[in-house]
Amino acid sequence: MKRNKIALAGTALFVIGALALAGCAAGGTPETEETSSGDPTAVISVNNTEPQNPLIPTNTNEVGGGLVIQSMFAGLVYYDAEGAVHNDVAESIETDDAQTFTIKIKPDQTFTNGDPVDAEAFVTAWNYGAALDNAQLSSYFFESIEGFSYDENVPELSGLKVVDDLTFTVKLKQPESDFPLRLGYTAYFPMPASAWDDLEAFGENPVGNGPYAFEEEGAWKHNERIDLVKNDEYTGPREAQNGGVDMILYASTDAAYADLQGGNLDILQEIPDSALQTFESDFEGRTVNQPAAANATITIPGRLDHFSGEEGILRRQAISHAINREEITDVVFNGTRTPAKDFTSPVIDGYSEEIPGSEVLEFDADEAKKLWAEADAIAPWSGTFEIQYNADGPNQGWVDAIANQLKNNLGIEAAGKPIPTFAEHRTLITERQATTAFRNGWQFDYPSMFNGLGPIYGTDAGSNDGDYSNAEFDALLDEGASAADVEDGIKKFQEAQEILFQELPSIPLWYTNAMGAWGESVESVEFGWDTWPILYQVTKAAE
């Protein structure tokens, strides 16, 4: 299958001279999007997972909550199906030096409760997300802004200034020309003034400014469904072509697949293992299987017995060599995954299969045994190597396959450790209560190599689930982010990966395709660069 690179459009096109964000239009829908006839009041349904946390943009960093936030809020920019950047709430984003940015907001925009979408709505939300005391999972995304600190609470970042109702400025600690490219991620979304009256209540019943809104108070029925309706007040480029979205929170993808077959679900955004060989014939002409900016990994925290220091590095390398990725992607996934060659994704600009050290991802049972024996010489292994995973997703098949390979190739006991739901799985991880290795992965927030590295492996980053820290790696990330030339930045990010290949804070497994299927009653179904279906453009026939 042809691989389409997602270029760092923002980085390549920022030069000195007060240029507006390249690739952003002042308004309107990108030409690549099509409108289709259908009942504008018809409600579509899609499967989803229970969000891990209350629905606050700066504290949502997983896919279940992310799909809801993305649907209910509008940021300064958004990404189309190919990952190109377009203005949404922003009228312009300008800079002379890639360090200080002036952001102007389109006038007359409101949240669904009538609060204005103004400069304060962004600055207050960003300050909250960045402050140490608030412990927001996405705080890392504000690290570049002047005044941010991991060591002390900073209620108001010195790099954020409100100029007037519709204008604010952002000053970074150093020039970072891809900064505007990040601004479509949920962490940078605005929040209404009313949210701060009772943030706990807001998390259960969020008020946004995007294409959709909660159908009513209490529309989030936990572990059952989240019902959204079209937000008629939203006038941006993502205007919904349907009457709303019912997000059904399934306990398993097999159940969701059965509902799609039975006509009780419109869009399925994940295919269960049991249907990988049949889904394209079951829904002929109504499926997607395409490369996307997502990957799968196993994280083995250094705090676990036998996985710290030199012993831990040797054991991670041994486990990586003991995994036959080709066999699993062919047999378990029926060719719908691609064995990993790096820590990012083939559709991200800068991807390379030739980074020194990447040979640790090659299957080599003899080398695996050798490395494991070297680790045993430091401290003999005992017990069972377990891999925690969420049972409500299609994970058991590949986890069992890896466990069997580790048994055969390392001579150890290995097994999966199922957790009922994705939300419970993530909570154990984020609260550092996971006592084993665990299934992990990354769905890119914005199309940049930095996003596949910094938020996951940078020291103190919000999605650094294994608490990895390496000063040399952090320095290379900073150098790459501040590089004036795109290619220079990519080289630094590739050098940073050399360190990851040596220490393996996570073990890359494979790249995840965007896979899904849909029913006969919906049209204009398209899955984006980030694996998500683009819900606002879906149309549905009248029932």
Segments predicted by a language model, with ranges:
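Ligand-site clamp/hinge motif
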Residues: 206, 233-278, 293
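Surface-exposed binding/hinge segments that line
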Residues: 94, 139-193
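Structural transition elements
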Residues: 338-375, 392-397
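Detector for C-terminal structural segments
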Residues: 19, 323-350, 394-405, 427-543
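N-terminal lobe/hinge region of extracytoplasmic solute-binding protein
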Residues: 47-97, 207
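A structural "hinge/loop" feature
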Residues: 48-67, 89, 115, 178-190, ...
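Gly/Pro-rich hinge or "lid" segments in bacterial periplasmic/extracellular proteins
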Residues: 176-239, 244
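Alpha-helical secondary-structure segments
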Residues: 117-127, 165-171, 211, 242-244, ...
